[in-house]
Design a protein with these regions (language model features):
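Residues lining hydrophobic/aromatic ligand-binding pockets adjacent to catalytic sites
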Residues: 1-176
Length: 176
């Protein structure tokens, strides 16, 4: 399965405005993965200076097909509103549950799958356990989870991902 990121032209230049033809071209590029059932979620990650524009969001979302999973990462806090969550939920599109040292998105589920981007510089053992509990709860509820750790400077992200994989495969410890 391949998770893809929407082209920067859509997220940082056009910012969903007048983007019909480029969106169509981008989606066409995903077609081989889609028809082979190897396409995972597609992430739209918007720049940190892009402020909320509900009219633009309302015009753009219908351009995206229902048979592909989409996640939206809004890095400007103005987007973190019930109005945005409702629009995403109405189309079964995920709010990317992103964490960084600069911004933490509320843990609002808007789709039948979870999409996590965990980009803090460090995660304690307790923090990683909490992440595993959240992911396990999604899986136990019949939802899929896509989880990505920061992977730039050292191997910790990959090690944490493997630790998470092992943790969710094992049953949770019994409570006393």
């Amino acid at each position: 399965m391949f998770a893809c990121k929407a082209h920067q032209n859509l997220t940082h230049i056009l910012k969903m405005k007048d983007a019909e033809s480029f969106t169509e071209l981008f989606l066409k590029s995903l077609e081989p993965l889609r028809v082979s059932r190897r396409l995972g979620p597609v992430l739209f990650q918007f720049g940190p200076t892009f402020k909320i524009d509900l009219e633009r969001l309302d015009a753009y979302l219908p351009l995206l097909p229902n048979d592909i999973r989409f996640a939206f990462e809004f890095r400007h806090a103005s987007w973190l509103t019930d109005a945005v969550y409702e629009r995403l939920a109405a189309r079964n599109m995920a709010l990317c549950l992103a964490e960084s040292d600069k911004l933490e998105v509320p843990k609002v589920m808007t789709a039948n799958f979870g999409y996590f981007r965990l980009r803090k510089g460090d995660y304690s053992e307790e923090g990683r356990r909490e992440i595993a509990d959240r992911v396990r709860a999604l899986l136990d509820g019949g939802r899929d989870a896509y989880v990505y750790f920061k992977h730039e400077d050292d191997p910790r992200g990959a090690l944490w991902a493997e630790e998470l994989r092992q943790a969710v495969l094992q049953p949770p410890p019994m409570q006393p």
